[in-house]
Amino acid sequence: MAVYSRAYDEKFPVVCMDEKPVQFFEEARKSFRSEHTGICYEDNEYIRNGTCSIFLFTEPLRGWRYADAQERRRKADWAKQIDWLLTVQYPDAEKVVLVMDNLNTHTIGSLYETFPPEHAFALANRLEILYTPRHGSWLNIAEIELSALGRQCIGTQRIPDLETLKNLLVPWATDRNLKQRGVSWHFSTDDARTKLRRLYPVLQV
């Protein structure tokens, strides 16, 4: 939580990252819209068409976010997202402070398994990784952005494939970035010590 209280510094941006699985569904029967009422009718039957993973990055203090969908969430997929983040989005940053969940793919080792040692070292040297606690993923602001993405971009519609999803993600992120939609985070370390006091160890003297 203390990292969210840091002043904005473009050389050391605080970026939050999270992932979201998405299932693809094709319509068993084509939907249609009534000419009289304008209501769209969908058949309850659908065909499962695989899954994918959304990778989302957000820099709360800048009001920026980026979402991309990939077929899988392997170590190499995460590593390639980090490579893009550092070389394309933040080429001039000295070090990116990256807040994320402690998943088995979210490690420096994933960089070395994906890229040549020299490039992996260069990427790792520009990262300051902060993992959220095991049961504290809600501390990751990227979860808030994923929630907004779910409501505003995906909703209840049936998405048939990866290309369709990618075509939805780009305008959603672009619109929120243009409107500078940020996150107002007020839960501080002092708040945690008060409201979550039962989770802190008690020193016996």
Where are these regions (language model features)?
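Extended, low-complexity cationic-aromatic segments
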Residues: 1-83, 196
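RNase H-like polynucleotidyl transferase catalytic core
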Residues: 41-46, 119-141, 157-159
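Acidic/histidine-rich, metal-coordinating catalytic segments
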Residues: 93-107
